[in-house]
């Protein structure tokens, strides 16, 4: 009986998926799986001296099913990673590609608007799902000018085409929230997304500049290059230190595909 139990336990452990296999099955990042298991959203087992995560296939399938039901996916909707050749869009004279994660540096109030407003305006006109992360004053400034060039802003907000994610104090929770929003949009059939992050918002919820830098790097690795999204992060030199601005440039390598004169405002 002891040998049978031992063989059963070994067989059960062999049937578990490691984190790399689970990430491949769900088509998500390993970082996402860690966040979901840490938050209790996704069950996992811990095995060995290293307490490595292991997953049952049925738990992963059930987790995806719940996510899809929540998103009300369109029949035959593509998964996020399937859109690899998304078109470019012109913003302030630049042809910006989807999947690019770029930054803009500005030093005066009008600089906040130069790229953010046309990016959102053209996105709303094209039917893209758009996200705006900003402090309340920053959001009000951008929306005021956006309404002047796109009168249907209120309708876009009401219809869920223009979304304002909650500004989270914890960067893992912020990334998790964005990932869920992007998954919901893409599972429901949306092929193109846009995000504007006026990054003073992160300081307003007490992130350090180092946390902002780490967040940008993880966004790059787990979201920005994975989803069919144009991501624009804006930095005000009057708010961020010189090191904070340097880190912004280091964490947005896609920016160097474009003329810096258009990104440094």
From Swiss-Prot:
It comes from the Bacteria. One of its GO terms (molecular function) is DNA binding. InterPro entries: DNA-bd_dom_put_sf, HTH_17, MEDS_domain, SinI_DNA-bd. Residues 17-36 bind DNA. Gene3D superfamilies: 1.10.1660.10. The keyword Cytoplasm does not apply. Keywords: DNA-binding, Repressor, Transcription, Transcription regulation. Monomer. Transcriptional repressor of the dcmA gene and of its own gene. This is Transcriptional repressor DcmR. The gene is dcmR.
